[in-house]
């Protein structure tokens, strides 16, 4: 078994032992028993997982507290997405959130010609030059984590003379029932705000203002 498989199995066992906040009091000996490894090997894996940012570790009178980070959870959800792809299982992801103001960055990025050409070719739309920003409700964060694990529709990044624009993945969705696309960087950014694009100005189309609740339905 290679190291990456050991890391995945260890995070899975920590998750199984954890509470709803992804925290578990686990000694290296107990984790060793769960993994069928030596105590020394389990201790090394815990140290490695912490160094790689998959978990955080604190020691108190109660013992060693292991907390799975967003990066660690992503490892689990990516495996879920891969199995879903192999088994041809479609995931219906429903998230709720509220409309929040943007910083103008969406318009800047969406208006790049290299992106627009790909949106037209791969998504079949020329998008309105701006994004609808939705702050995902805490109750929907597990669904957002699940979505991050899927590959979506690949939008290639590119370079200009003065900067690099990263690759993006897009997912067909419905925003309050209106066909649209949820986009996110392929390089994971841990945020609870998602961006929606459409060929329509969604704020006008859906009569939305900041603070209004929105439901996003994605088929991944």
UniProtKB/Swiss-Prot annotation:
Metabolic or biological pathway: Cofactor biosynthesis; FMN biosynthesis; FMN from riboflavin (CTP route): step 1/1
GO molecular function: DNA-binding transcription factor activity; metal ion binding; nucleotide binding; riboflavin kinase activity
Residues where CDP binds: 102-107, 200-203
Enzyme kind, highest EC tier: transferase
GO BP annotations, alphabetical order: FMN biosynthetic process; riboflavin biosynthetic process
H-T-H motif-like: annotated span: 1-92
Keywords for this protein: Flavoprotein, FMN, Kinase, Magnesium, Metal-binding, Nucleotide-binding, Transferase
Pfam families, sorted: CTP-dep_RFKase, MarR_2
Segments for region (Riboflavin kinase): 93-220
InterPro entries, alphabetized: HTH_MarR-typ, RibK_CTP-dep, Riboflavin_kinase_CTP-dep, Riboflavin_kinase_dom_sf, WH-like_DNA-bd_sf, WH_DNA-bd_sf
Cofactor: Mg(2+)
UniProt: FMN binding residues: 188, 195
Origin superkingdom: Archaea
Keyword Magnesium carried by entry: yes
Tagged with keyword Kinase: yes
Positions that bind Mg(2+): 131, 133
Catalytic reaction(s) noted: riboflavin + CTP = CDP + FMN + H(+)
EC number annotated for this UniProt entry: 2.7.1.161
UniProt cofactor note: Binds 1 Mg(2+) ion per subunit.
Cited Gene3D superfamilies: Riboflavin kinase-like, Winged helix-like DNA-binding domain superfamily/Winged helix DNA-binding domain
Functional note: Catalyzes the CTP-dependent phosphorylation of riboflavin (vitamin B2) to form flavin mononucleotide (FMN).
NCBIfam families cross-referenced by the UniProt entry: PRK14165.1
Family statement drawn from the similarity comment of this UniProt entry: Belongs to the archaeal riboflavin kinase family.
Protein name per Swiss-Prot or TrEMBL: Riboflavin kinase
Lineage: Archaea, Methanobacteriati, Thermoplasmatota, Thermoplasmata, Thermoplasmatales
Gene encoding the protein: ribK
């Amino acid at each position: 078994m290679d190291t990456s498989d050991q890391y995945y199995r260890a995070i899975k066992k920590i998750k199984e032992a954890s509470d709803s906040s992804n925290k578990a009091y686990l000694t290296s000996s107990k984790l060793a028993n769960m993994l069928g490894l030596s105590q020394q090997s389990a201790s090394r894996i815990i140290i490695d997982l912490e160094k790689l940012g998959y978990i955080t570790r604190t020691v108190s009178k109660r013992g060693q507290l292991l907390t799975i980070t967003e990066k660690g959870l992503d490892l689990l959800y990516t495996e879920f997405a891969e199995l879903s792809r192999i088994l041809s299982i479609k995931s219906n992801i429903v998230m709720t959130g509220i409309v929040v103001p943007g910083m103008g960055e969406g318009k800047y990025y969406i208006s790049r010609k290299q992106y627009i050409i790909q949106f037209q070719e791969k998504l079949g739309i020329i998008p309105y030059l701006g994004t609808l920003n939705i702050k995902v409700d805490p109750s929907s964060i597990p669904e957002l984590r699940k979505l991050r694990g899927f590959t979506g529709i690949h939008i290639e990044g590119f370079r200009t003379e003065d900067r690099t624009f990263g690759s993006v993945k897009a997912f067909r969705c419905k925003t309050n029932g209106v066909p649209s696309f949820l986009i996110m960087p392929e390089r994971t950014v841990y945020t609870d705000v998602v961006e929606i694009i459409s060929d329509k100005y969604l704020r006008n189309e859906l009569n939305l203002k900041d603070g209004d609740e929105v439901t996003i339905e994605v088929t991944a």
